[in-house]
Amino acid sequence: MAGLMVSGTQVSYVGQSCREIPEHLGRDFGHFAKRLDLSFNLLRSLEGLSAFRSLEELILDNNLLGDDLVLPGLPHLHTLTLNKNQITDLEYLLDHLAEVTPSLEYLSLLGNVACPNELVNLEKDEEDYKRYRCFVLHKLPKLKFLDAQKVTRQEREEALVRGAFMKVVKPKASSEEEKAAAPENQPQYTPLPSGSRDLTSHRGVLGKGRYFYYGRNSEGNRFIRDDQL
């Protein structure tokens, strides 16, 4: 089937312009898939994801997922990337993730309004991003990596003391921003040709300090784990 790639326990359905998770994916692969990549689609809902109960990694970059995002209980999920979606309500998302993904250790939200950094919004600065990290770690203290940056001991300590006071206020969208967020005004990304895509490769978003790269051809945010350092 065009656009579908399966390698062991890894399933990739990238760049197919689907607005919902195809039923056949859950029926055919949900019982064994541990890594699912649905990036570069038009997803607004994750209905159907409940068929993938054994997921450990979920890549949802470059979709249209917003503040009504609902995930099923995924007790084994340790990696979640939601880069370049339409998420603005950080606190709601974090509370939801704390409830349904208790094993989560790697999270990336780059390219969402909920993740303030200068590459997305020139009105934000490094201090805004630090406060965001502090609040996220307060809500999800088990995280080891956030937005491709390793969580430091200092950040953990600060989150324990100050995290509850670092809430990032949800911005009010202007009419111009709402118009720009409409699907017809979203850029159309073209994924890598299937022949050049390797499901076992580790492409992704690398960050050092305050600067980030999240490319249009990224297959999903890949994190460097402790055993790779």
UniProtKB/Swiss-Prot annotation:
Start-end of the LRR repeats?
A: 32-53, 54-75, 76-97
Instruction: Give the span(s) annotated as Disordered.
Output: 174-203
User: Which example biological process does GO assign this protein?
Assistant: melanocyte differentiation
Where the record annotates domain LRRCT, the positions are: 121-162
Q: Note the InterPro entries from the entry.
A: Leu-rich_rpt, LRMDA, LRR_dom_sf
Task: Show the Gene3D superfamilies listed in the entry.
Answer: Ribonuclease Inhibitor (3.80.10.10)
Q: Cite the entry's keywords alphabetically.
A: Differentiation, Leucine-rich repeat, Repeat
The UniProt entry, under Pfam families, shows: LRR_9
Function, in words: Required for melanocyte differentiation.
Entry protein name = Leucine-rich melanocyte differentiation-associated protein
Provide the species name. Mus musculus
